[in-house]
């Protein structure tokens, strides 16, 4: 877009229309004309938790990657566990009420760093651009630094978290490499390692809130999105549903179910259930609960995700029973607090 040149810059009357604005200063009107998503972190305020409500402390076993709230994964390195707590309705020093995520090291004395991350999906247009990360935090861990990993390597910015267990606001920059590929993971670590590289002490913790990644070299106010907007952004990577979709029996023990995703997923997802089994899955109207497995198969998109629309695909459900080929049905998960899982996360 060409820059707009005006004779009276920075003066836009409250009743201005687009024609009037065309005579204004470009830097003033550009944010209005080009408004869009600012925060490339998804669920930076921890409202979306499709896997369950983790308001109670969750024990994360050693060397085990766990996602509690959407898009945030933690993995304790070393021989001990860490505790993840999802705190709701906290109040920050500026008076804003929000949620926070807290990671606390257990009795582990050989864990050299925190590994709580969000992987932001990269795109080519990010090449050579500068992004700013900002968030609120509190910690008791001395000499703690954050970290990021781009498509080339991992780096610790020259900033340190204040270990006084009070809330502080911090921002730091990510200068992207000159050639950023599509679909790679840009890892954001709000806290990572002590400057000395010493192991974490037992009881060391990091708690953080309102995480933002935005284009440019200045941290601006947090971008608030509606719950529905945030959920749809999270759906690109992970979805849970109690109704999978309708379809037809392709054979006596094989049901083809057509899945229509609310948004295009990052790639063809892996299907599973919350329980890990299939005994709570029913194909109406049979009420047999005899599903033995499921996978994304016949007729589904398998191409490059930067040109393919992974929003419609076929799931084949196998059964131990028999039904007439050509009959229709609806695949549902309707007992024991179970649900379908579609996973296409980074």
Describe the residue ranges of each PLM region.
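Extracellular "spike/adhesin" assembly and maturation modules
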Residues: 1-19
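Extracellular and organelle-lumenal recognition/adhesion modules and their flexible linkers in secreted
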Residues: 3-4, 20-346
